[in-house]
Amino acid sequence: MCHARAARQATGEAEAAPRDNFSKAAGSKRVVGAAFETRAQRFLERAGLAPVARNVTVRGGEIDLVMRERDGTLVFVEVRARTSGRYGGAAASIGARKRMRLLHAAHLFWARMGGASACRFDVVAFEGGRLVWLRDAFRADETA
């Protein structure tokens, strides 16, 4: 599919707020998830990326954020949040099945955009109020 050259990992701080609960109620999860996506998008915009799309849904997959680097690279972003890293953390919660769904959705979106630009898959993870940006977190040609 598309690849961009590997880049370094960046971290930033995001303050935890008392209202940031991780309730299992479906509506509440959506609201909390949207808040974390907004935080991630703002962080990435401050880092120089431009927003392209948000919550792209296709049959069989969803992409939280689609951003564009200054060099034109299309960046598909998965946003994850966990209260702690106790069970491997937010980034570790993206298993092979989730990666396949992300890749499927990204491939369809990328093709719809003309398929000409390089792209990569990033993860913005929130763990206990700390934001971690994993650039080039995984690749389309990786297996489980």
Swiss-Prot record:
Give the Gene Ontology MF terms in alphabetical order. nucleic acid binding
Q: Which organism is it from?
A: Burkholderia thailandensis (strain ATCC 700388 / DSM 13276 / CCUG 48851 / CIP 106301 / E264)
Q: Which InterPro entries match?
A: Restrct_endonuc-II-like, tRNA_endonuc-like_dom_sf, UPF0102_YraN-like
Cross-referenced PANTHER family, in alphabetical order? UPF0102 PROTEIN YRAN
What is the name of this protein? UPF0102 protein BTH_I3148
Annotated family: Belongs to the UPF0102 family.
Q: Where is this region: Disordered?
A: 1-20
One protein family per Pfam: UPF0102
